[in-house]
Amino acid sequence: MNEKSFNYDFSVIMPIYNVELYLTEAIESIINQTIGFENIQLILVNDDSPDKSEIICKEYAQKYPNNIVYAKKQNGGVSSARNYGLKYAEGRYIQFLDPDDLVSEGTFENVLNFFDEHKNEIDIVAIPIFFAEGRTGEHNLNNKFSSTRILDVEKEPHHILTHCCSTFIKKDALKNIRFDENCKIGEDAKLVNLIISQKKKYGLVKEAKYHYRVREDGSSAMQTAKANKNWFNHSLITFSKNLIDIIKNHEQKIPLFLQYMVMHDLKWKLLIKDISETPLDENEYSEFLTLIREVLSYIDDDVIIETKSVSHFYLYHALKIKHGENYSRYVYERETEQDYYLYREGKIVSKLSDQTLTIEILEENEDSIHIEGFWSSLFNSKGFKFYAKIGETKIKAKNIKRQHNDYISLGEVIKKYPGFSIDIPKGHLADNHHIEFFITKGKKRKLTKLRFFKYSGLSNDLYNTYVAKKDYIFYYNYKKLMFKKNNFKNRFIKEFRFLKSLHKSGEKSKKRKSAIKKALMARMVHHVFTIFNRKPVWLFIDRQDKADDNAEHLFKYAINKNDGVKKYFIIKKDSKDYDRIKKYGKVIPYRSFRHKILTLSSSKVISTHADIWVVNPFFNMEIYFRDLFNFEFIFLQHGITMADHSEWLNKYNKNIKLLVTSAKPEYRSIVKGNYNYKKENILLGGFPRYDNLKKSEGEKQLLIMPTWRKDIVLPKDQAKGVRPYNPKFKDSEYFSRYNALINDERLIEFAKKNNYKITFFPHPDIQQQIVDFEKHDYVEFADYNSSYQMLFNSSNIMITDFSSVAFDFAYEKKPVIYYQYEKSYHFKLDYYDYKKMGFGDVLENHNSLVDKVIYYMKNNSRMEDKYRKRVDNFFAYTDKNNRNRIYNAILELDNNKVAK
């Protein structure tokens, strides 16, 4: 099988650094190749790894002395390690396998067969990439693997190759090419494309698989790129510019395939909003912008515009950066007798008659039909107007500013979303059966197409969708929003047609068949349930697995009201709070079939959280039930809003009917902010749980309660509501700071002498890491299921950082200390200033923090007067009547009123 000049068919070079958790699996995937391990040389290059990788390497090298070479070198980075490994390579073909990835068993056999068949045509073969661990699915560049074939990059330049690990390279092709050790990001794409540039072709082997591990600890290079300073100017210089310079020496023009590849990397940099999203200083950021402009100058306009996986708004902004003052000569708008057009270099790219309006909200009020949405287009939005037409009546749309939807690139607002609102009096519906929407510019007016988002109740992705409101049923037909009277006959016909369409689509798609079968069953059960249940249903939920927050406190209050409303609390059945709440109220297991049916039948969903899992227990099956999500969402909040969360909590993303606030400045910041709610949607009522806060009595206690940090925890499992353990958490400053605090002997000794207990209770999103902390005998670690209320009521002093629990604690005028050793947190504050508005000292130093705690212990845990005054000025109510205010406000929603 082997040629005379080579001892192996393949040499696999594996650069190793800090991968002991994954290394064995990677090595075994090579050993188990169907081609036979005797035909493979495995070169393990230890780049001075500090973990136990060396032990694993030596064990395998000893077990397979004829196949495995182990080499150790001084740390120099992945390119250095790969180049070092090439010195030992004795195979015909080279693969650079990352030690946390895998290859499918038949990969080498399939690749060898392909090389044997096409050995003189190509120097490199690529295989498709599939994600593993932290992400599922396949790489978005896999679309070129329609078949096993040779790809000619001059004929298909848009099919780019950016990953060297999923390629196999002829050793002879690497004689004069090495990885650029000065290039820290993009070094593999650089090498691969320099090789491709020789023959302008490469092979594709569809049958093989490269399993790319996206680590759950967030440490894959792809995941951490933007946090790395090298991702900015360094990569533009050593990767993009240098690659262009090398090719310029050999070719008159940069080949299209290389332009596409460079633009593929550059497009992610266009998503940077401004300097605040970078680790750069002002001079470095200025250079960053200059480098982007310089690289774009080598990329054809068509290549820029045809770049995939990024909005056209960013791509046209790239054209604007490239052409500067001359941009208007390349991209411009013109009106003709037929239409209004957008041109790029003389070619029509958009026209007024081809525009689409998106309807996001469709509501039926007492006297009108209320419609809200937006228009997204490459046209400059200035001068465009919208109106609805019903019969012969035209109703102008009101413009709505939607700053949270603005597209921002590199410090410039590149696209504003024109939002609109239309109220159609019900009197116009009597003699008509459809509504049309028009867009105008100058003298031109054109009928628009329609697209629907979730709060409309309709969908463009399913046939025969409809939504039944109080008096009317709405559906659509291409460019018309249709309606008819809501009666049993019309509802039955629309539902029958929708279910029939669903059933047909399920028969055509095996992938969707199971989901559609469940949807059909759930919809039928829902319709039967509504026949027998005429009472309104309210659902209350805190977290999936924990109660004891605002929703439970309000639930406990509301169930004692004789108002004809059925009230249920939603929580996981294995939660410790499930049986406790069941003793006094009705409890439904989270995501149980009954929970799902009740969601479809509910009039109110009331929660301390606004995440998708609160309002949608169906998760990705939501599309089949969109028309039945008719409940009003009441957001009680978990903590007081200090930052601008309008990008997340805005009306079009969450559609909150009543958002409860507790503080005067908080209320003002939301009413006047970019949330797009009306004043009556925001209630200044106080948190329900505040009604049960008490002054501490009996034992004295110091409560240490820091919040979480998104950069030190792993992504949350939305279904389970938990985060997996992060082995790198102990490397964080957060860990070292709080571990030192809860083991500080000076603090502990003084607490002992003065009879103060010390309790440590970090945020629930840190609880999976609690095992990492060193536990002092005197310090109690509060259980995850501990009652917040009991902890607040039994404590005298609190240490926190940025957490909103400080508000609960200070509400009873107990002393709070803010331990803020960082310069910034993971959100930007809106109106709130800790030093000017906080209820205690803001400290950065460990010793100063301990001094302040001791001061309070010496002074009977009394909050200073200046902070007591701040409490009085901040909170709207301290009368223990918050639950009543909120309960009455929810009742009055049905009358479109909010209790003042």
UniProtKB/Swiss-Prot annotation:
SUPFAM superfamilies: Nucleotide-diphospho-sugar transferases, UDP-Glycosyltransferase/glycogen phosphorylase
Signal peptide: none
Superkingdom of origin organism: Bacteria
GO molecular function: CDP-glycerol glycerophosphotransferase activity; glycosyltransferase activity; hexosyltransferase activity
Disulfide bonds: none
Cited function: Involved in the biosynthesis of galactosamine-containing minor teichoic acid, a non-essential cell wall polymer in B.subtilis 168.
Protein name: Minor teichoic acid biosynthesis protein GgaB
Organism: Bacillus subtilis (strain 168)
